[in-house]
Amino acid sequence: MAQTQTFNGRRRVRKFFGKIPEVAEMPNLIEVQKASYDQFLMVEEPQGGRPDEGLQAVFKSVFPISDFAGTAMLEFVKYEFEAPKFDTEECRQRDLTYAAPLKVTLRLIVFDIDEDTGSKSIKDIKEQDVYMGDMPLMTDNGTFIINGTERVIVSQMHRSPGVFFDHDKGKSHSSGKLLFAARVIPYRGSWLDIEFDAKDIVYARIDRRRKIPVTSLLMALGMDGEEILSTFYNKLTFIRDGDNWRVPFSAERFRGMKATADIIDADTGEVVLEAGKKMTARMARQLADKGLKAIRATEDDLLGNYLAEDIVNMKTGEIFLEAGDEIDEKTLKILLETAGNEVKFLDIDHVNIGGYIRNTLVADKNESRQDALFDIYRVMRPGEPPTLETAEAMFHSLFFDAERYDLSAVGRVKMNMRLELDCPDTVRVLRSEDMVAVVRTLVELRDGKGEIDDIDNLGNRRVRSVGELMENQYRLGLLRMERAIKERMSSIEIDTVMPQDLINAKPAAAAVREFFGSSQLSQFMDQTNPLSEITHKRRLSALGPGGLTRERAGFEVRDVHPTHYGRICPIETPEGPNIGLINSLATFARVNKYGFIETPYRKIVDGKVTEEVVYLSAMEEAKHYVAQANATIDENGGFADEFVVCRHAGEVIMAPRENVDLMDVSPKQLVSVAAALIPFLENDDANRALMGSNMQRQAVPLVRAEAPFVGTGMEPVVARDSGAAIAARRTGVVDQVDATRIVIRATEDVDASQSGVDIYRLQKFQRSNQNTCINQRPLVRVGDLINKGDIIADGPSTDLGDLALGRNVLVAFMPWNGYNYEDSILLSERIVRDDIFTSIHIEEFEVMARDTKLGPEEITRDIPNVSEEALKNLDEAGIVYIGAEVQPGDILVGKITPKGESPMTPEEKLLRAIFGEKASDVRDTSMRMPPGTYGTVVEVRVFNRHGVEKDERAMAIEREEIERLAKDRDDEQSILDRNVYARLSEMLIGKEAIAGPKGFKKGGALTKELLGEYPRSQWWQFAVEDEKLQSELEALRAQYDESKNALQQRFMDKVEKVQRGDEMPPGVMKMVKVFVAVKRKMQPGDKMAGRHGNKGVVSRIVPIEDMPFLEDGTHVDIVLNPLGVPSRMNVGQILETHLGWACAGMGRQIGELIDAYKEAGDIKPLRAKIESLIPDNDRNEPVRQYDDESVVRLSEQLRRGVSIATPVFDGAHESDINEMLEEAGLNSSGQVTLYDGRTGEEFDRKVTVGYIYMLKLHHLVDDKIHARSIGPYSLVTQQPLGGKAQFGGQRFGEMEVWALEAYGAAYTLQEMLTVKSDDVAGRTKVYEAIVRGDDTFEAGIPESFNVLVKEMRSLGLNVELENSSRFDTPPAQLPEAAE
């Protein structure tokens, strides 16, 4: 085979253990966010033809707005966005919101109204663009920048609009009877509940108000009693037959009935069923087949039936009996006398069909539509007297007015499905047919037909993503605005105004600001590492406005449901009160246009598994039989086994292979991104896997990232989609590289109008939201060929484009002197020495100089009463130098604030006038380093208000920025020149010129040498005879000039932005931000974890020579407790250890082969090793096609340890691990003999040793350790505050008091409760005593005692503190008590 392929070494190659082919492409992991918001803004859509959704729909629903008289109307025409003022980077630096101005075109139409006829004619039309505030834009990574911080809008899970049927599980009534209820939930508008009570009467409730009989609701819809009965019941016709009656026979009605008397055929008179026997379904069917038409009924059989129609005297119109009346002895008489030969009864048998609606109608006091409407009006607006008009209008507005009631397309679709209606999804209000269908379905449920709904089924819960949440919020803002517009239209002279004068866009802009700033779903992005970013964007929350609350959510809502499969991850959810309420989207899941989560399946046609992939929601999936992704498939593409394990209707069953019609696309489709990163997930207990998924999100990016030896193949996907690693936008060649930027010259799909240069700016040591460090490093060299999508730079926690959250370390599972008791972790000093788990954290400090009443604050180096030593790190402007090492208490920015003046004596005034200002008028308010923080200043930013003079430091920063912009411009210009002039010389060489620059002689073709004689800028003066070529030359020139000017214009715009003053909060003149970087090495007290939920705290760091070592003298890095595995059942960590050991062993072998090749020059053994290691299949790299150089490059990468991928649920088996261990020349038990580093003795038995991927978590002891001597006190109780952030003290709580009481340490206790806490006078005295060197003090009354007394007084109990001197008199002298 020709060795044609090259390997550039810029990506990590893994050996894949997965056996199941990947059929479907995994969707982009932040698609949920981006697609939703794009659909809302529709920036790309042409303005005229935008579909009615998102922002367009909001404007369409609120406009047109008419005034109260109908003389004018404001219509919406279109909207557009202008370019945002600042790009994302500038917004981050200047604390601004990344947003684009929204321009809306409105049309004001003024009408002339004819006073006599009332007809309207158009008088005037004006159109105008109106600015409607700024609309935040989403960055490429799916986040928003609000006031300079990155935020994520979390998607919300809520109950889908539509109709739901449920029962109370027998809880409401003591008899345990099931009371059924239906609820119609609109997207917005009034809820309608229809429910049974214990007496089987059907009631309706509107918006959880008082209940009314459902028949009143139906009457209000315009039905009368007879119509209601005929809607819900069939009619049964009894025909008089002499003294008896004939009843039609139907098998359906009589099956399962027990005969009380003989059943006799009305035609033949024979007995078809004797009394006391039961008619089975089969018997009923046989009788019907034999031709039994009717059976005989006596007059007594009429008793207990209900009339279906009124019985009326035709002559007088008098009603003898009403529809729904029950036939008893008295009414039977009337019936026999007045009825004709035919009587219609309601088909109610109290077995299959209950008389609930009929009973409700009888119980209902309302007789007519008017009564019913009045009744509903009284319930909804108690205390107001109803009139027919107001009652009708109110009832109409409740359910039938599109302004007030909106089912939404989803609600209509769900209703159609549940009630088997056929209504287009554009009808968004309720119809009377819908209400009748709801009541009918509810009654059928009560009769035992059909099933109740499962609220937790994902078919009944939908996702509201950013776009939709934003749409609702914006609609609220526009509605607030609409009221103001209406009022203004009526109060203003309408002929003279423009649309702009009517509109105040503040409410709309405020609604947007409020949503992004303070909504529960707008969250500060978790930016600890790339995985935590992605997970945050894919999160689904059941909390938030219109959702559940933690306290009210029961067990069912939080539980895993069968429909979660492939849609919501069953593993990843927080521990604690939010468990199950906050979930994560599964890897392949996507949200459809209705907001339901869909998951992909492969289609199975005629028993063959096809490559065709369909996405199904939970509702659509219910009727299918779905096979697992790991079902064995034979060579023909069919199932190998007769019976296949599959899922159907929420159950796992064995189904014959002919029935199976779908199959999972991938084994990892049921878990989320974080869970899919855990190798051997299938061998971990679910609770530990949950902890593993959650802790990976807390891993701190390390100084040297290292991809795991044992991965799952998801690593590159996360690194790419999170935006941490930079991917090339176009194919091209690298032109320049340094640490801060990469310049690539595009070689493909270069459009004439676009620039042919891509400049990628790398982020260097930027602070993330969690104070971790964002730093990107280039992976490419000048001259490298880059394909579109290649990774060209690594970011935080990525290594060659793979996610790298931790480090591979050599671990031994063994006890070590009790230092790994209770999950503690013992570390080797090598980890600290080699900076293996060292991370950089960046703290931001900000200081503002305000304009105060007493005069402006000033940022300066000239601070009163501060030694020169303390100012050593400040420059002349009073701002710390970059690179200064700072400690607690050091000044970062010098600032002075004017002090309040005390009135001056005339002498002082005189002295003041002679000698000028005196320094004591200002106090030092400099910003100092807080306690417990050390570090190096890495960046300083200075912001000035417009018109405030800039200091030297601000000018220097500005110059640096402009130089950087100029360099970008020059590079782009030089690449543009190179490209254009190369193209120009191509066009000219070999052609005959008819004109040229000065001194050019005509004749002969142009050559490269000839062109070289003239400067490039003069080449444009050559002209050729061929007109077509000449016009091409001119077009090239025009395009070149245009590009050049555009480039210069862009540069000028940016420079102008840099030089312009900054927008500041009111009263702020100047702001300085200082960034301090801290290097945090591993230390005892830091928390570490593996990927399997195996977490622990570092207990001790041991010198390398004392750690246990292997036979070759290698010391282990970390010792874990073997007892942490069996009870926790996370065996994945042991398998990972063994496999990691094998990877490292293989790496050693490859390293030896590389060294041999470098000495001897024979590559064959190395190539054979690599080819045997990475077999040829569609998931692995085609190493057999690599050229020699690529093989060496790949081997160098594998030398530290072979990287492998063991996908979840489709990973390496025990046999694979044994094979790898043997291939690496290691014992297949994975255990080795260890020696004690302190004595050199062998340990008693072999120990499991291997490589495990450990993470350093964000719970660092440096952030938690804290000490206080004197600090702030609480205002009311005068006790010290609590917590590190408040510089608080340690609470000596109730139990600690008990401990001191138990010891009898009375004085210590008194001290704790008084002078060390809230005895104000006492603690000042103690301080003074200590200063004097005296150690005696006296305790007084704690302030909290005074608070208690005050509180008791507020309850009316007068508590007074008696002075003890009254009781000092001896008892004998006390006045004697009266006898």
From Swiss-Prot:
Alphabetized UniProt keyword annotations: DNA-directed RNA polymerase, Nucleotidyltransferase, Transcription, Transferase
Stretches that traverse the bilayer: none
A Gene Ontology molecular function term of the record: DNA-directed RNA polymerase activity
A GO CC term attached to the entry: DNA-directed RNA polymerase complex
Pfam families in UniProt: RNA_pol_Rpb2_1 (PF04563), RNA_pol_Rpb2_2 (PF04561), RNA_pol_Rpb2_3 (PF04565), RNA_pol_Rpb2_45 (PF10385), RNA_pol_Rpb2_6 (PF00562), RNA_pol_Rpb2_7 (PF04560)
Keyword Transcription assigned: yes
Domain of life the protein comes from: Bacteria
GO terms, biological process: DNA-templated transcription
Enzyme class: transferase
Full protein name: DNA-directed RNA polymerase subunit beta
Organism: Chelativorans sp. (strain BNC1)
Lineage: Bacteria, Pseudomonadati, Pseudomonadota, Alphaproteobacteria, Hyphomicrobiales
